[in-house]
A protein has these predicted regions:
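Short, intrinsically disordered, charge-balanced linker/junction segments flanking boundaries
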Residues: 118-122
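A short, well-ordered alpha-helical element
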Residues: 31-59
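Structural motif
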Residues: 28-30, 103-104
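Poly-acidic low-complexity segments
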Residues: 16-18, 34, 106
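Short, aliphatic-rich beta-strand segments
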Residues: 22-28
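Short beta-strand/loop segment at the start of cytosolic alpha/beta domains
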Residues: 1-18
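Amphipathic alpha-helical interaction surfaces in cytosolic regulatory modules
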Residues: 37, 42, 59-116
Length: 122
């Protein structure tokens, strides 16, 4: 299984799912015209990751780093779905660590991240 790398644009984030290190990183802006379509390759990759590395007990930990500078409402909805997938992965014995990074002067992004992660725990 190879890693997944999606190059960022002005409207979409760089996404790097590094299989060797079991890390998933989101960088910069996420305001794609169609968030569901943009994130579909990542959803498919996570499904395959679960089949190959999680169910075979190869992976014990996954670290997710959100390093957005901005994301829109459509992206937030997709992120809720993604976090739901990761919740299922934790139920299979994988420790999923989620880190939320934000610019020190951006309280809005801090609050949005806190809300997103709090909703996932519900």
């Amino acid at each position: 299984m190879n890693s997944l790398k999606i190059e960022g644009t002005t409207f979409t984030p760089e996404i790097n799912f590094d299989i060797e290190n079991n890390t998933l990183t989101f960088l910069k802006v996420s305001k794609p015209a169609n968030a569901i379509e943009f994130y579909k390759p990542l959803f498919d990759f996570i499904d395959n990751f679960e089949k190959v590395k999680v169910k075979s007990k190869i992976t014990k930990e996954l670290v997710i780093d959100f390093k957005f500078t901005y994301f829109n409402t459509a992206t937030a909805k997709v992120l809720y779905e993604l976090l739901g997938k990761f919740k299922k992965i934790t139920e299979q014995g994988v420790d999923v660590v989620v880190n939320w990074y934000y610019p020190s002067d951006d309280d809005d992004l801090l609050e949005e991240g806190a809300e997103l992660l709090e909703e996932d725990k519900a």
